[in-house]
């Protein structure tokens, strides 16, 4: 592992630790968050956001700070456009919150769920240890 050997991840973690100390916050647990807009299908860029955040989490731990990564899928965002390959009837639901639109294929509670499930699957396959959260969960 190269984390702990002066990578940019180590530098980011160092600056986070210093900032938290300067503002007087506890270092008992530092949360790192990665976000995904649930409008479209996750892609390499979406996964790289989660992977970079996980790298910062790991660098914090190498520097002795307990941390956790929360992957947040904002299913309260409005549906901006219907991704290619999705049913045309979804066009009548722009710009409603994704959590208020029924699942396009009947296998999830609402539109944002299958998108979030794809991100969870990608992070699991990438062996990224994170907690998952949807905006509609509060």
PLM ranges: what are they?
Residues 1-138:
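N-terminal Rossmann-like or analogous alpha/beta NTP/dinucleotide-binding catalytic cores
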